Amino acid sequence: TMAYQNYDVTVGGGAPGTTGGDQNGSNSVFDTITSAGGGGGKGSDGAGGSGGGGSRDSSPGGVGNSPPVSPPQGSNGGTGIFAAPQYGGGGGGGAGGNGSNGNSSSGGPGGPGTSNSITGSAVTRGGGGGGGTFAGPSGGNGGPGGGGGQSTAGTANTGAGGGASV
C-alpha cells in the first residue's frame, strides 16, 4: 500500500546506437526504486553496452543485469557476425530474454519483454531492439514488448529498445 504523498520520479533517457565506447541509457527512479538504463548498441566494432546488441564485426552483445541486482534487470544482447552479404548485428536484450545473434543474411531479433497488469490489463513491455545490418535492409525485428525494428524507435512508454540503423 502506498501512502498519499509526493514521490520523486525520474524517467531515464534511452541509450544511443554508437560507434565509440559503451553508452548506456540513464536510470529511471521512483522514490527509492532505481531501474538501470538500457545498453547502447555498436555501430562498427565492439560489444554493446549492458544488454545492447553487438556490432557486425563478430562482437559480443552487452551483458544484461549490469551491475548485478536482484531481481535481475535486463538480459544479454546478441552477438554480431562478420559474414557477407548482410553482416548482421546482434539484437538487444529484452526485459524477459536475451537478444538473438545476427547472421549473414539479417540482424538478430531483439529479446522479448515481460508482461504485467499494472494498468488493469496485461501489457508486454521492455522488448529489445532489433540488430541492424551493414550491407542491406534486412535488420532484425524488435522483441515483443515494443522493441523497434531496424532504424525504428521503440514504442513510447514501454521501456523498449530501438532498432539499430544501417
Where are these predicted regions, by residue range?
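Low-complexity, glycine/proline-biased repetitive segments and flexible coils/loops
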Residues: 1-166
